[in-house]
Amino acid sequence: MSNLSRKQQTQKRHRRLRRHLNGTAQRPRLAVFRSNNHIYAQVIDDEAQNTLCAASTLDKDLRTSLKADGSSCDASNAVGDLVAKRALAKGIQQVVFDRGGNLYHGRVKSLADAAREAGLQF
């Protein structure tokens, strides 16, 4: 058994992932943060240390259209679709997916699938 809490395990995985993931201007990083109640996605250029676009379940565009709270797979689909549309509007087509130390399952996976369906390539 591990002596680390689940949050500490997630942070450890995230540190390990970030050693290899780096966003550039041509291929920025799509970073996902998942809390208990909401999900957030940002497209980040690590070289310029600049956030190019972002979306979350707290966005005004999504708050009215979401029926449940922001902790469902449907909400993650909406966030993935919105962040992909905003990235494509800025001319970003390819990204590097950063799952933030979370397992690629559930809400993180549904966000990634929705972003792919909307046109982002990763």
Curated annotation (Swiss-Prot):
SUPFAM superfamilies: Translational machinery components. GO terms for molecular function: 5S rRNA binding; structural constituent of ribosome. InterPro entries: Ribosomal_uL18_bac-type (IPR004389), Ribosomal_uL18_bac/euk (IPR005484). It holds the Pfam family Ribosomal_L18p. Residues 9-21 have a biased composition (Basic residues). One of its GO terms (cellular component) is cytosolic large ribosomal subunit. The keyword Ribonucleoprotein applies. The keyword Ribonucleoprotein applies. Residues 1-27 are annotated as: Disordered. Gene3D superfamilies: 3.30.420.100. This is one of the proteins that bind and probably mediate the attachment of the 5S RNA into the large ribosomal subunit, where it forms part of the central protuberance. Belongs to the universal ribosomal protein uL18 family. PANTHER family: 39S RIBOSOMAL PROTEIN L18, MITOCHONDRIAL, LARGE RIBOSOMAL SUBUNIT PROTEIN UL18M. This is Large ribosomal subunit protein uL18. It comes from Prochlorococcus marinus (strain MIT 9303). The lineage of its organism: Bacteria, Bacillati, Cyanobacteriota, Cyanophyceae, Synechococcales. The gene is rplR.
